[in-house]
């Protein structure tokens, strides 16, 4: 399914992210047991509408337009990857051009730390998907800025998981 450029804005940006899929209920995790609740990992393109992100103090508005994010296409079980999905390349290519080239080893918070923090706030349930943040190279930070437009092809790749490929289309009524 294509990602959609909304009618309200042309500033749809890509964000390659690691998706962490929860496999069992968890609350008040510790660094020692946090990864025990992880079923597996996938790819996520956290499509962001940059001008709407900047309309307030929270970025939520720019993260929740219909069909601007994408998830998948595979779920790789936690035991098939390095512990905590550590040391995996995370990349974005737009129309074949490499625009993001990061590594999970460079995340501000590793998977275990993210899960500990999240489980302090809420109960994690099977099927919950937590995304980890994006490497450097997003479109709005480039000079000049790059935004996805209809006809583009965006690939998010996480090493050991696969490639999430989306065509970009305009929102239809």
Regions found by a protein language model. Name each.
Residues 30-42:
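Short Gly/aromatic-enriched secondary-structure transition segments
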């Amino acid at each position: 399914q294509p990602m959609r450029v909304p009618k309200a804005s042309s500033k749809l940006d890509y964000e390659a992210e690691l998706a962490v899929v929860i496999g069992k209920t968890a609350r008040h995790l510790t660094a020692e047991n946090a990864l025990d609740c992880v079923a597996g990992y996938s790819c996520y393109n956290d499509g962001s509408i940059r001008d709407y992100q900047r309309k307030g103090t929270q970025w939520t508005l720019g993260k929740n337009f219909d069909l601007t994010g994408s998830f998948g296409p595979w779920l790789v079980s936690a035991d098939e990857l390095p512990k905590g999905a550590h040391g995996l390349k995370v990349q974005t290519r737009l129309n074949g051009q490499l625009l993001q080239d990061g590594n999970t080893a460079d995340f501000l918070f590793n998977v275990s730390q993210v899960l500990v923090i999240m489980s302090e706030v809420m109960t994690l349930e099977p099927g919950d998907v937590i995304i980890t943040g994006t490497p450097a190279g997003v479109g709005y930070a480039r000079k000049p800025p790059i935004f996805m437009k209809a006809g583009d092809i965006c690939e998010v790749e996480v090493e050991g998981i696969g490639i999430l490929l989306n065509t970009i289309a305009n929102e239809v009524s």
